[in-house]
Each structure stands twice: as structure tokens, then as C-alpha cells.
Amino acid sequence: MPQYRSRTTTYGRNMAGARALWRATGMKDEDFEKPIIAVANSFTQFVPGHVHLKDLGQLVAREIERAGGVAKEFNTIAVDDGIAMGHGGMLYSLPSRDLIADSVEYMVNAHCADALVCISNCDKITPGMLMAALRLNIPAVFVSGGPMEAGKVILNGEERHLDLVDAMVVAADDRESDEDVATIERSACPTCGSCSGMFTANSMNCLTEALGLSLPGNGSLLATHGDRKELFLEAGRLAVKLAKQYYEQDDESVLPRSIASFKAFENAICLDIAMGGSTNTVLHLLAAAHEAGVDFTMKDIDRLSRKIPNLCKVAPSTQKYHMEDVHRAGGVIAILGELDRAGLLHREVPTVHSPSLGAALDQWDINRETATEEAKSRYLAAPGGVPTQEAFSQSKRWTALDLDRENGCIRDIEHAYSQDGGLAVLYGNLAEQGCIVKTAGVDENILVFSGPAVVCESQDEAVNWILNGRVKEGDVVLIRYEGPRGGPGMQEMLYPTSYLKSKGLGKACALITDGRFSGGTSGLSIGHVSPEAAEGGLIALVEQGDRIEIDIPNRRIHLAVSEEELAHRRAAMEARGDQAWTPKDRDRPISQALQAYAAMTTSAARGGVRDLSQILGSR
């Protein structure tokens, strides 16, 4: 039977010094026999998704103590991708994921904590903490800060529901008045919480439910609603319970790696495909699987994407629905329930809160006769409609649940938005290791597309060309040297896609990059091209005007240039010597921190994880 890790610092005469320090934090004699639960918070005033978390760590801590544990809170960093977007700050976003994972590992292992509660929310914080939890493999529970309410505004006599992307698009549209732009800017992000659409943050928080590491409603219950408080309290109680199950009952089934198995990762990507989640989730799931020691790859994602339909369409793929609407329709559990009825889910996998996912569905799927009154009540939590930065500040409820699986926010298999899933992996000579497209956001008229390449050596160059009218209908904008190594940091391309929309080209052009896209991106936007340009990928050899062919139904992407010509171009590239596979005429200062990241990172096809052999082998 395993001993509490914390006894390393609390047991025996030789630990008198450590105990003296523990006492200085408030611990007493009786506490040294209890499990020490680390509360990894991520409060910051920089990020609306985290601005309300300041007191929530202590809320969880007090509940841990009531449940018989000792709580010790610490904080990680959190980058706001929306604020960091469109300038050099975005270079730091993906690298911050590794920094967050490392910081959680450092704190938990340095102090020998027994279990972990992860209070996350936004884009890189949830995946960073997820990587850490799977790396540490001690009992862990996730609880996120919750989604933001959708913005609401009256324009031209009509109510519009808004999010961050609307503000970006209208600001670049010369047809919009300054007054309307200002109105939308002030209304788009009305409350604390992660941005209100199915962007990266909300996608990842939904996936923690499918992986079995968070409670029902975690991905969709609004940050402002009083019902969300119970998720935080239950997370604290659950962490103590799981710690005692593992250390006192030798029950390894409660460990993160036992829960997040290969089958659980399959469930997670099936949810992702069904709900049309952010393409960034692919990057993060691959990285999490790597930490868990699970052999889950792009080929698995490709295989499942061919049989999972698109059952939920939310902003940015449509402005009709936001996360508050997903919640009213039953949230993640409802989507999983529809997949389960179609035989597309592994029901037997365990979760932190139920003996199996199947048992959880029976209790929490609001479209089942076995659904509890607690479940029906939880999913009635509605937006309050009052701007606020305060968690749990309102208690408004819908008058009825959205149980319509034919025309509602969440559909059943027979009435799917499309039988083709919301995410797809494309392969071809331009992406031999694969690339990702969010098909849920692609207009059906351009699922098959070809056009001349407009080659840009950076995101900045692409933005300049789009805004200055150099990109025309039918073009394929190609942005390269923005991958994990080439950027470095694999920037998001939300501004280029938003500006294409503002110019009326959102359904008339394609955009391809070895970088990535914001969860707020829609349109024919293909990212994660692997291998990236900096690794010798074919994307580095594309020239202006080359024809690029995209066929999403057949999962194909192809550069229509002869092998002989490509061989000639490759030889010319290699002849550049030390400058081979680097961008021409790009002046971008790179800090030592980012250089270190670039030296160790890998391709998007591997999740952009660290591979130390790349530097150890050079010694």
C-alpha cells in the first residue's frame, strides 16, 4: 500500500525542520496525519477568464479542510491569447503551456503533495495543468473558472449575440461606423470567464469532462452563475476522497493515468469532433497523451474523424449559439449521451466522480429518464445579463431545458449538422505528417477548393497584404515559418482570418499555415502543417502562384508542382547553408527563453512537446 507522499516531509525526528516550516504556514500536530492537497490556482488580473479566481482557491481550500485534508494553494501564470494576439506577445502563448506544466510539477514534487486540485480556465492553462497532472500521476481533480456570458447588443433594432471575434471583425470592416464598432467592443465581453464561444479554453474545459477528470457541467456552466460554486466545493471534497482511496485503500483506479487511458482519449477526441472544438485541442490532447504514456496519435484522430458526425455548432461556427446555449441543452454530457446512443463511446471508462462514464451518463444526461433532478436543475443555469467580474454573482434560470435534438443547439445522430465531423486531418505532399482543419467552420461550398498561393513569410506580412487588398477571391494565403520551432512558439492566426472576413473573403479564400489558429477562427483555415517549414517541410518550398488543392471530403491537401521542380527548389534551399529553412527578410527579435523553447520543441503532429534528445544528442 502506498504511503502518503507528504510523510517524506512530516514524519520522523529528522523532519523536525520541515515540520517547523509547515507549522509556520498554519499546520498543527493533527494535520501531519492528513493528506496534503495542492490547490493549483491561476488567478491573474490580466485575463478575464482568470480575474475572478482570486478567492476561489481559498474556497476550495476551506472545503478540503472540512473534508479532512490539508490544503496548500499556489499560483501559475496565465497568458491571455486575445490580448497577446497579433504582435510578438503571441510567441509566448504556446511555450507558456510547458512553463505551467513545469511549475505545477515543481511545486507539487518539491513539497511532496499527495493530491491536486487544478483551477484552470483559459487557453494554455488547462492543457498545461493537464500535462502536469498526468506527468505527476497523483489523484487530481479539475475545476475551471467557467465560460463568459455572450455579449448582447441592439443594433438596427435587432438583438445580436456577440463574442471577442465580432469586435475584431467589425473593427477591420471599413463599412462599419466608429459608433457601432465602439458599441460592439463594449458589449462583446461582458463578464468574467473564458470567451463565450467554442474557442480553445472552453473546448479544453469540455474535454476534461470527457477524459473523466472534472465534474459534469465543468465545461459549460457560466462563471457568473451561483451553481458553479458547488463544482468548486465538490472538487475539494473529491480530492480528499480520491487521496484516501489511493493511499489508504491502494486503489490505483483513481489516478489520472488510470482514468485518462487510450479509450478515454478516444472519447475526448470523439467529443471534440462532435462539438466542432478548437483545432488547438488536437495539439493539447497529443501533448497530454504523451505525458500519460498513451500512444494516441494523429492517425487515431484521423480514423475517428471519419465516423463521428458534427452534433453541436457554436460560435465561431455560428452566431446563433454560445456556451450558455450548450449548457441549457445539457452540456458536454448531453453530447456524449448522443454519441453513446450511437455506439460511438467507451462507456466503461472510469471518471473521478463516477465508477464509469456510462453511470455518469445515466445520472447526468438530461434526455434520459434516469436523469436526476440535480442534473435537470444544474443545466437550467442561465446568463444573468449584467456585466460583472464577480464569480457566482447571479442565479438566473432558464424556464425550460433545450431538449430538442432535431433543431436545437445539440443534435442527435439522425439530425446532425453534418455527418462529417467538426474536425478533420488532411494529408498530402504539403503535409506528409498531417494538418488540421475545423470543418464545422467551413462553408460547404468550399470543402473542395484550389487556388494560387499567396506566400507570406510571417503573420505580419499576411495581415498587411490582406488589409491592403493584395489578397483576392480564390487565393490560398500561405503563412510559413510560424510553427513551434520556426516562429518560434506557433502563433495563432486569428487576425488574418478575421480580416479575411472583414474584407468579404471569409468564404472565398483559404488560409494554410504551419502555425495554428485561435479557437475563434472559422473559414477554410488549415493549420498545424507538419513537418513545418523550419524542419524542412514542403511548405517552405512553395512559391508565389503555385496551385494548392484542398479536398476535405477526401482528406487531401496537395501542392501541384512536379517532383522535378520540387527537387530543384530543395537543392536551392540547402545551398543557403546555415540560412536554409529560415525565412528571408524577416526581422524578429527572439529572446533566450524562446530560443530555448525552439531548441527542444517538436512538430505539431507530436503536440509540440519537448524532446530533449534534440539537445542532448548535440553534446
UniProtKB/Swiss-Prot annotation:
The entry's keywords: 2Fe-2S, Amino-acid biosynthesis, Branched-chain amino acid biosynthesis, Iron, Iron-sulfur, Lyase, Magnesium, Metal-binding
Single GO term (MF): 2 iron, 2 sulfur cluster binding
The annotated active site, in chain numbering, is S518
Q: Which domain of life is it from?
A: Bacteria
* Co-factor(s): [2Fe-2S] cluster; Mg(2+)
The protein's matches in SUPFAM superfamilies, at most eight in alphabetical order, are given as: IlvD/EDD N-terminal domain-like, LeuD/IlvD-like
Kindly list the positions annotated as binding Mg(2+).
D81, D123, K124, E492
**Positions carrying N6-carboxylysine:** K124
InterPro entries from the entry?
Dihydro-acid_dehy_C, DihydroxyA_deHydtase, DiOHA_6PGluconate_deHydtase_CS, ILV_EDD_C, ILV_EDD_N, IlvD/EDD_N
User: Which reaction equation describes what this protein catalyses?
Assistant: (2R)-2,3-dihydroxy-3-methylbutanoate = 3-methyl-2-oxobutanoate + H2O; (2R,3R)-2,3-dihydroxy-3-methylpentanoate = (S)-3-methyl-2-oxopentanoate + H2O
What this protein is reported to do is described as: Functions in the biosynthesis of branched-chain amino acids. Catalyzes the dehydration of (2R,3R)-2,3-dihydroxy-3-methylpentanoate (2,3-dihydroxy-3-methylvalerate) into 2-oxo-3-methylpentanoate (2-oxo-3-methylvalerate) and of (2R)-2,3-dihydroxy-3-methylbutanoate (2,3-dihydroxyisovalerate) into 2-oxo-3-methylbutanoate (2-oxoisovalerate), the penultimate precursor to L-isoleucine and L-valine, respectively.
Q: Which family does it belong to?
A: Belongs to the IlvD/Edd family.
Output the HAMAP family linked to this UniProt entry: IlvD (MF_00012)
> Per its record, how is this protein called by name?
Dihydroxy-acid dehydratase
